[in-house]
Amino acid sequence: MTQTQSNHLILDFSHVYCDENIPRNDKLHWIHCSDIHECDLYCSDAAATEIHRRIDPYGTRGIHFLDSGNYHYVTKIMTDRIDEPFSLILFDHHTDMQSPMIEGMISCGDWARSVLLDNPQLQQLILIGPKKADIQAIYNDKEFTAKQKKRLKEKLIAFSAEELRADEGHEKVERIRMDVPFYISIDKDVLDERYCETNWNQGRMSLSLLEHLLRAFLETGNILVIDICGECQQGIPLPEYMEAEEKNAKTNRKLFEFLTHYIRRKSTIPRQKAPRHDEKA
């Protein structure tokens, strides 16, 4: 695989980033995806193969913008390319762990379930932001086999929106492994509507809390990729659309600047080899 110079990507499925007036520069490489069929909400094998082909030259590092939450399944395509043990940190108002609706297709609603159950390199999935009831629904899902339930119990660590607001769940932090690199995936629907407007119902997290939680991983962990999705709904009245786009563009810029600050800073610090999970630090 040949890796190009810029690892920061914009995957343009709906041209939403064009409407946000994101400047084109050498920091962000645009990958045009609007001509790919069978990829909105649900993604066929053919579409997944084509998406993989287009992102393959850019490696598995950097910050990637994935368009709206309809395309959040791209995170699965990205993580399928990782050839070393890793953990997925998922910020999302939804669990994205529904039972598959259409055989042979991944979707924005079930991709995380597929990563958890099927990716042999996944060590942990740290899910941050859904409602407590939605997290409990994962454990109550009767479609899991006994083997899948065991894997779920071993690998899933979930922090509900209620726990975050009450500053609870600290005991679960101790379970997070720090000896493997992190893939961080952010769906902006975890944020309150003051900060962005997405095409899905949203949580109530502040941008400052999201940055605080991200900082805990960015300062101490080895980060492979950070992806961001969650853009506004298409087809709404133009004044509402432009207002939403302005709000989303502002948050996208803030997140990009915040994340690149940590990436630049850590790139100047010699990386120390992390202890194995069975070793004492």
Listing of model-derived features with the role each one plays in the protein:
Residues 2-66, 70-87, 110, 120, ...:
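Catalytic cores of soluble, metal-dependent hydrolases
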Residues 88-100, 111:
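Long, hydrophobic, well-ordered secondary-structure blocks that form the structural core
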Residues 105-106:
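Glycine- and acidic-residue-enriched helix-capping/strand-helix junction motifs
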